[in-house]
From Swiss-Prot:
SUPFAM superfamilies: Glutamine synthetase, N-terminal domain, Glutamine synthetase/guanido kinase. GO terms for biological process: glutamate catabolic process; glutamine biosynthetic process; synapse assembly. Belongs to the glutamine synthetase family. Homooctamer. InterPro entries: Gln_synt_N, Gln_synt_N_sf, Gln_synth/guanido_kin_cat_dom, Gln_synth_cat_dom, Gln_synth_gly_rich_site, Gln_synth_N_conserv_site, Glutamine_Synthetase. This is Glutamine synthetase 2 cytoplasmic. Its EC number is 6.3.1.2. It is found in: Cytoplasm. It comes from Drosophila melanogaster. The lineage of its organism: Eukaryota, Metazoa, Ecdysozoa, Arthropoda, Hexapoda.
Length: 369
C-alpha cells in the first residue's frame, strides 16, 4: 500500500516495529491485560479501554463490573455520567496475545437499567424463550475501506473507477485494494475465537465482506460486534478507515448490507422447506417493523440502500423468491432443491445492530409476535 495514499494518516506514519520490543517484554504468569469493548450511544460505534487483572478469568462472570464516562459516549448527562460495563463474552487478544483478552460488554445506566443502545438484554431474553427451536444465524458483513480523507480507497481523487463487474471476488492490483487488511482481520478473528467462516471482495471496488456463523442464538451478536471491533482496530494500525455505512457512495454503486441467514432445527430437517415458507409468510406481515429494527436510525440509513436496484429490494415492499437477490427474502437454489436448510433476509443494513436483527426475527418466526 503506497505511502502516497496514506500520507494524510498519522497512524500510517508510525513505525510499527518499535512496538514489538515492548510487546515482547515478559509479564508475570498471572497478569492479564483485558480490553473492555462496548457499543456507544450511536448504536453503531465501538469504544474500548484497558485494565490489568491479577488472575486468568475462565468466564465473563469472573470479571469485574467496570464504569466509564457515559457523557462522553452519548449515553449520559455530565452531571450523572457514570455508566457501567458488564462483561458478557471473552475473546483471545490477537494484538497482545498470551493470556490477554478482549471482553465484550453490556452497558447499564447508574440506576441499573440498560442504556438505550443496549439491545443485547432483550435479545437474550427472546433467544432464551426460543432455545428449544435451536435457531442458527449467519451474517454476511459488508464494509468499505476509505482513505483518511473519507474517499474510497484506491479510487481516483478526481474521478471514478471503471463500472462494477470485475471487482467481485476479484484478483489483481487493478481490481482489489487492501487485501492485506482483510487477511490480517480474518486471521485475527480466528485467533480470537470468533466463528468467522469466510471473506471475499465485493461488487464495488474497495468494498469487502466477511461472514460470521453459523452461530446459535445470542452468540452471533457477540461474535459480529467483536469482529467489527477487530476490523476497526486493525484498519487503525494500517492507517485506513473501515466504514459500515450502507451506501458510502451515491450513484450507480452497490451499497453494503448485513445479509442474515436464518434456520431453525425444523428448517434444517427433511421437509424443512415448509417451515421456511411459513417463516417467510410471517415475515411478510411485519415488514415495516423489521425495517425499523434493521438499521440504527430506524430505516433512514436503509432508505439510501434499499432502492430496488443494485441487488436490493424496495424498502417499501416485501418480496421473496428463490435465488433472487432483488428480494427481501432469498431462498437459495440449493435449499429449494434439497427441501430443507435456511433462508436469507437481505434487508439488514451493514451498520445494523445484530442483537436487534436477531430479536426481531425470533419474535416474528418463533414467538408469533
Amino acid at each position: 500500500m503506497s505511502a502516497r495514499i496514506l500520507e494524510d494518516s498519522p497512524n500510517a506514519r508510525i513505525n510499527k516495529t518499535i512496538l514489538d520490543r515492548y510487546l515482547s517484554l515478559p509479564l508475570q504468569e498471572n497478569i492479564v491485560q483485558a480490553t473492555y469493548v462496548w457499543i456507544d450511544g450511536t448504536g453503531e460505534d465501538l469504544r474500548c479501554k484497558d485494565r490489568t487483572l491479577d488472575f486468568i478469568p475462565q468466564s465473563p462472570k469472573e470479571l469485574p463490573v467496570w464504569n466509564y464516562d457515559g457523557s462522553s459516549c452519548y449515553q449520559a448527562e455530565g452531571s450523572n455520567s457514570d455508566t457501567y460495563l458488564y462483561p458478557v463474552a471473552i475473546y483471545k487478544d490477537p494484538f497482545r496475545r498470551g493470556n490477554n483478552i478482549l471482553v465484550m460488554c453490556d452497558t447499564y445506566k447508574f440506576d441499573g437499567t440498560p442504556t438505550d443502545t443496549n439491545k443485547r438484554k432483550t435479545c437474550l431474553e427472546v433467544a432464551n424463550k426460543c432455545a428449544a427451536e435451536e435457531p442458527w444465524f449467519g451474517i454476511e458483513q459488508e464494509y468499505t475501506f476509505l482513505d483518511f480523507d473519507g474517499h474510497p480507497l484506491g479510487w481516483p481523487k478526481n474521478g471514478f473507477p471503471g463500472p462494477q463487474g470485475p471487482y467481485y471476488c476479484g484478483v489483481g492490483a487493478n481490481k482489489v485494494y487492501a487485501r492485506d487488511i482483510v487477511d490480517a482481520h480474518y486471521r485475527a478473528c480466528l485467533y480470537a475465537g470468533i466463528k468467522v467462516s469466510g471473506t471475499n471482495a465485493e461488487v464495488m471496488p474497495a468494498q469487502w465482506e466477511f461472514q460470521v456463523g453459523p452461530c446459535e442464538g445470542i452468540s452471533i451478536g457477540d461474535d459480529l460486534w467483536m469482529a467489527r471491533f477487530l476490523l476497526h482496530r486493525i484498519s487503525e494500525e494500517f492507517g485506513i478507515v473501515s466504514t459500515l455505512d450502507p451506501k458510502p457512495m451515491p450513484g450507480d454503486w452497490n451499497g453494503a448490507g448485513a445479509h442474515t441467514n436464518v434456520s431453525t432445527k425444523a428448517m434444517r430437517e427433511d421437509g424443512g422447506i415448509r417451515d421456511i415458507e411459513k417463516a417467510v409468510a410471517k415475515l411478510s406481515k411485519c415488514h415495516e417493523r423489521h425495517i425499523r429494527a434493521y438499521d440504527p436510525k430506524q430505516g433512514q440509513d436503509n432508505a439510501r440502500r434499499l432502492t430496488g436496484k443494485h441487488e436490493t429490494s424496495s424498502i417499501n415492499d416485501f418480496s421473496a423468491g428463490v435465488a433472487n437477490r432483488g428480494c427481501s427474502i432469498r431462498i437459495p437454489r440449493g435449499v429449494n432443491d434439497d427441501g430443507k436448510g435456511y433462508f436469507e433476509d437481505r434487508r439488514p443494513s451493514s451498520n445494523c445492530d445484530p442483537y436487534s436483527v436477531v430479536e426481531a426475527i425470533l419474535r416474528t418466526i418463533c414467538l408469533d409476535e
